[in-house]
Swiss-Prot record:
It is a single-pass type II membrane protein. Residues 33-377 are lumenal. It comes from Sus scrofa (Pig). The lineage of its organism: Eukaryota, Metazoa, Chordata, Craniata, Vertebrata. This is Lactosylceramide 1,3-N-acetyl-beta-D-glucosaminyltransferase. InterPro entries: Glyco_trans_31. Signal peptide: none annotated.
Length: 377
């Protein structure tokens, strides 16, 4: 009798536990499906998505539809790279109110005169933006932008509202401008205004690629088989009407990537045939690239949305690091110090930096920075 009572209680416990488990699963299934199952689905589909034309066909404009949106230039510099040998056309995506960020970039990695005199290369830096989104601040900010451009002549602005949901319009602005006014640039780079670019390392790299005559080149931090976010509370939410497939084509993080000049032309042409309502600009770049059969290459020292550790052994080969606003000028001073190159000189210097990079980059827990393989590059 006593044993029978224990069996009943045990069975009741199992029933209660099973009920709680099912209820919990029902409650959390949405997030689980969005974050885990969707990643599994998307990675399974990525080869199909990358290989077939039906994705592009579903997003292509119909013949009866008008082309991409047309916006007027409010500020423009058609002459910026006219009749010049331009190694790199550098677009910086910025917001109208981010004057301090633009100022810091002009004094560091975006400084054309520094690159010309110290690195023997010709780059053209342009800040791309729309109109101020706050109606109360719009007139004052616009006057300030006009004054700023009068001082520096490096702003390109069209009359769409500058917001997260218009990032693809900013993408179209960059490629339209490049195609119209600087088609001869050897490379094109697009970057956020809170990124750090190690310009000496990047220029050395691009000059070597130029000598090789590379084409069909697209490099950055690659996202493979990323799924659309279906959580309506996320700012990255994408509806099935906007994009119906379980995975995006491979693409590079929009924080910073580089393409060759021939790719810039092809991407612009592809962008004119696709529906630009998908507002995530780096994904839209992936769709354009998929249409022309271009595959992105991953570079260990492009951080994507990640932030790199602060250490001279990291600076030696770094290309980009994300999330630098307040410390940008200090990092520029430290990372471009000629002494950095001396740390890894010789056998013991190489061993020392190898150990440092393994400790900083090869951790068991996920770290959004350079991959572990960068420690051995």
């Amino acid at each position: 009798m006593f044993g029978s009572g224990r069996r009943v209680k045990k069975w009741q416990f199992i029933q209660i536990f099973a009920t709680c488990f099912v209820l919990s699963l029902m409650f959390f299934w949405g997030p689980i499906d969005n974050h885990i199952v969707s990643h599994m689905k998307s990675y399974s589909y990525r080869y199909l998505i990358n290989s077939y034309d039906f994705v592009n066909d579903s997003l292509s404009l119909k013949r009866s539809e008008d082309g991409t949106p047309r916006y007027q230039y409010l500020i423009n510099h058609e002459e910026k790279c006219q009749a010049q040998d331009v190694l790199l056309l550098l677009f910086v995506k910025t917001a109208p109110e981010n004057y301090n960020r633009r100022s810091a970039i002009r004094n560091t990695w975006g400084n054309e005169k520094y690159v010309q005199s110290q690195l023997n290369a010709n780059i053209k830096t342009l800040f791309v933006l729309g109109t101020p989104s706050d109606p109360l601040m719009r007139e004052r900010l616009q006057r300030r932008l006009v004054w700023e451009d009068h001082m520096y002549s490096d702003i390109i602005q069209q009359d769409f509202v500058d917001s997260f949901y218009n990032l693809t319009l900013k993408f179209l602005l960059q490629f339209k401008w490049a195609n119209s006014f600087c088609p001869h640039a050897k490379f094109l780079m697009t970057a956020d205004d809170d990124i750090f670019i190690h310009m000496p390392n990047l220029i050395e790299y691009l000059q070597s690629l130029e000598q090789m005559g590379v084409q069909d080149f697209w490099i950055g931090r690659v996202h493979h088989g990323a799924p659309p976010v279906r959580d309506k509370s996320s700012k990255y939410y994408v509806s099935y009407d906007m994009y119906q497939w379980p995975a995006y084509p491979d693409y590079t993080a929009g924080a910073a990537y580089v393409i060759s000049g021939d790719v810039a032309t092809k991407v612009y042409e592809a962008s004119q045939t696709l529906n630009s309502s998908l507002y995530i600009d780096d994904v839209f770049m992936g769709l354009c690239a998929n249409k022309i059969g271009l595959v992105p290459q991953s570079h260990a020292f492009f951080s994507g949305e990640g932030k790199t550790p602060y250490h001279p052994c990291i600076y030696e080969k770094m290309m980009t690091s994300h999330g630098h606003v307040e410390d940008l000028q200090d990092l520029w001073k430290d990372a471009t110090d000629p002494k950095v190159k001396m740390i890894s000189k010789g056998f013991f210097g190489q061993i020392y930096c190898r150990i440092i990079k393994i400790v900083l980059l090869c951790k068991l827990t996920y770290l959004d920075t350079y991959p572990c393989r960068a420690a051995f590059a």
